[in-house]
């Protein structure tokens, strides 16, 4: 009987921007026959989606430190010490051959534990500006990867290989043909993030109303509002819901949504930028102005610099500015085709494979 393949532990937590790329790497490793377990928390998205993927989740007692009161920081430091002890015991007990960190504060104590116990440590930074945890772990890691150039300081040796994405998106990308040329209604996908984005929800329905009332009915909208915001947005669209407008709190199948869309209006999370490139979709990007280290603006530059998107600052976003952009695109469909091609040219589709290859090289070196 063939020997059981080694165990690899994933570390990622908090938001989908960390968890979903880690799931993509985990899926690749599982497809190669490796055992995969996960270090996370009971508070983040991983607590729901990791067990649903059939992967064992080990939870640490750790909390974020940044942006809190002094008392919260003291508590977080105590939790950090406890989490480090938990991580040391977990890594000793489970004995992984390699540990992969994909961001989120849970990666901190688990990554330090892996380093202390001389386990190969691989880290991947999704954003164009590295987060605190990955900046601290980078000098300890055996391999450092980034989704975009410029994520780390020049004194850190790292490789840019894109962000891992779910397999269904890669499969949809093979059929990503961009066919909008103005002969049918423009399909606008509005995505404010999994938790929604109130400024986007407040502005878009009014802009669409003004567009249609001005005589331009050649548009369809699929609007993700975020949980708990869909009723208000439906009321804002009103009678337009019978004229090609769809509203949903959350879109489960983003591959279908991107395939449907001719233009996407969205925030600038690292995973969103990567998915736009993989699917070759032009975008209006609205960076979250208060994101830590302003990383969403840096993420947006990846697409705006190559011509795959246009950026709209939140402070400048109102019904008039959105209406003006939509009118420009409707009047110049060739511009959208050019942007779509530029976005797709920036795609790096095989990041999960590269991270998995690195794990294998470290384990069998």
Predicted regions and their residues:
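A short, well-ordered alpha-helix in the C-terminal region of glycosyltransferases
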Residues: 335-349
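Acidic donor-binding loop of glycosyltransferase active sites
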Residues: 96-98, 259-274, 281
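C-terminal alpha-helical cap of glycosyltransferases
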Residues: 348-365
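Conserved nucleotide-sugar phosphate-binding/catalytic loop shared by glycosyltransferases and other
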Residues: 5-13, 30-82, 227-229, 313-315
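Conserved donor-binding/catalytic loop of nucleotide-activated donor transferases
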Residues: 117, 259-261, 277-286, 306
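Active-site-proximal region of nucleotide-activated glycan assembly enzymes
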Residues: 35, 45, 56, 115-175
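Glycosyltransferases and closely related glycan-assembly transferases
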Residues: 86-100, 107-122, 135-140
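Donor-nucleotide binding loops and adjacent catalytic segments primarily
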Residues: 44, 49, 53, 174-264, ...
């Amino acid at each position: 009987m063939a020997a059981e393949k080694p165990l690899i532990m994933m570390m990622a937590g908090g938001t989908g921007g960390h968890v979903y790329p880690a799931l993509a790497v985990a899926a690749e490793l599982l497809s190669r026959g490796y055992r995969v377990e996960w270090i996370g928390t009971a508070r983040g998205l991983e607590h729901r989606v990791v067990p649903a993927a059939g992967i064992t989740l080990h939870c640490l007692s750790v909390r974020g430190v940044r942006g809190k009161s002094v008392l919260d920081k003291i508590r977080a430091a105590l939790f950090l010490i406890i989490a480090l002890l938990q991580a040391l015991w977990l890594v000793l007990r489970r004995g992984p051959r390699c540990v992969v960190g994909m961001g989120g504060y849970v990666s901190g104590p688990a990554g330090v534990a892996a380093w202390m116990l001389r386990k190969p440590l691989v880290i991947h930074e999704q954003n164009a500006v590295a987060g605190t945890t990955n900046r601290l772990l980078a000098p300890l890691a055996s391999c450092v990867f980034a989704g975009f150039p410029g994520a780390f300081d020049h004194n850190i040796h790292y490789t840019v290989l894109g962000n891992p994405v779910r397999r269904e998106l890669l499969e949809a990308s093979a059929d990503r043909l961009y066919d909008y040329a103005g002969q049918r209604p423009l399909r606008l996908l509005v995505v404010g993030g999994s938790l929604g984005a109130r400024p986007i929800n407040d502005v878009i329905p009014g802009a669409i109303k003004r567009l249609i009332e001005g005589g331009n009915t050649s548009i369809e909208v699929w609007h993700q509002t975020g949980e708990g915001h869909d009723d208000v947005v439906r009321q804002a669209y009103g009678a337009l819901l019978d004229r090609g407008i769809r509203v949903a709190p959350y879109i489960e199948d983003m591959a279908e949504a991107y395939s449907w869309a001719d233009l996407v209006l969205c925030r600038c999370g690292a995973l969103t930028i990567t998915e736009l490139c993989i699917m070759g979709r032009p975008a209006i990007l609205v960076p979250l102005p208060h994101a830590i280290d302003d990383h969403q603006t840096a993420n947006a530059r990846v697409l705006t610099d190559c011509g795959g998107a246009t950026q709209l600052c939140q402070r400048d976003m109102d019904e008039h500015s959105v209406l003006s952009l939509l009118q420009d695109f409707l009047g110049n469909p060739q511009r959208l085709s050019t942007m779509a091609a530029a976005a797709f040219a920036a795609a790096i589709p095989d990041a999960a494979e590269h991270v998995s290859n690195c794990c294998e090289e470290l384990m069998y070196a």
